[in-house]
Amino acid sequence: MIDVQTKQTYSVSKTHPDGIFRIDDFNFLYNCNVYSYDTILFKYAGYDTRGFIDAQLQYYLKLNQPCNFETPSILNHYARYIADCNVLGSLVSLPKHEDIAYDLFERIYVAEKQPGLDFYQNQLLSAFYDIEKNGIQINPTKFTEAFGQSFSVNEDKSYTQYNYYTTTGRPSNRFGGINFAALNKDDGSRDCFVSRFENGSLVELDFNSYHPRLIASLTGYDFGSEDVYEHLAKHYHDTQTPTKPQILQAKESTFRQIYGGISKQYLHVPFFKAAKELAERLWYFAQDHGYIESPVSGRKLILANYQDITLYTLFNYFLQMYETEFNVLTLKPIQDQLQNHKTVAVLYTYDSILFDVPSEELDYLLKEVIPQSIDLNKFPVKIKKGITYSEMKLC
């Protein structure tokens, strides 16, 4: 521990063999501003972290980049030569721990509370922690066939770990050598993920045409009750009855325009005209003020933190930040309604959420929780259900 005013270091311990001042909670610090490098790790260790300030998150919100603090060489040394030891920290002397902590403090400490901290720490970190701790039930044999041995597995569950500190603001999800954000749909590897409940099922909530609809929510554009890409195909091809190939082409063109920049030839389409105006408003605001601000969290994307950024790169960063924060606003009420139930969210992948559901709670999830948590007129969803993650069928 470090007193940020005096820079004095202290050692408190729960299990270290040299610890004199041993603790089981941090109640003695509740009247202080407590900065922790990673509040989620403290939560996994069983500590109450209410009132803590996540220093890593503060750093990220200020600089829009992660703190790349390398694991100290002494811990790497022990990890290499005593690979099966799960108490490596106890092998390092307390004075050395203090040195490591002070080095980290010097690199990461940001005193001023950053815009967006309350939302990111109290809602975003909490929402993804609640998913991580549930794990995904696996068939051990099929899991090993698909992924080999992985330290992500414990008691027939594979655990995930979200990394929030990305350039775009979209959490990545790679843990134990597995990229859970991009599991292959075609090679059978998803077949190892199953329900933890007897006669249970995996249920996937998948947002339709998510980014166009997010842009529509920001601009006031109304797709009505139409499929987004059918709606846009009518404008692309000047027809009220677009063909399936025309709708598919509209989908491909829409992705290119949103992520690569909107071409003049598409500005006759009202949706793209509105999207371009939004991108330009954000860009001009950033040029004048040096940042743009999230309408959800108040987080600032600071222009000086990005080298050679363009109008549409900034627009994409803004859109992915908004997507993530909007998803948290969706996740939290769902998780709140499931608190006293067996159903759990087990995986989040940008525009979809995977649930593990016992048979007796399926109707509750589909007919009560989801409709009460999502405006299905503005954000329609597809619901798929399966015994394994590779056998999902539309409900």
Placement of each model-derived feature along the sequence:
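Acidic, low-complexity, intrinsically disordered interaction modules
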Residues: Q114-L117
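Conserved RNase H-like, two-metal-ion catalytic cores of nucleic-acid enzymes
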Residues: M1-S73
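Helical catalytic core of nucleic-acid polymerases
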Residues: Y44-G46, D54-E112, L124-N134, G176-N179, ...
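Interdomain boundary/hinge elements
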Residues: D375-K384
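Long, charged/polar-rich coiled-coil alpha-helical scaffolds that serve as structural arms
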Residues: F119, S126, I138-K142
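A glycine-rich phosphate-binding loop feature that marks nucleotide/adenosyl-phosphate handling sites
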Residues: L124, T144-A146, R256-Q257, F271-K273, ...
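Acidic, glycine-rich two-metal-ion catalytic cores of nucleic acid-processing enzymes
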Residues: I2-D25, P140-K244, P295-L338, K342-P358, ...
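Short, low-order "capping/linker" segments at domain edges
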Residues: S390-C395
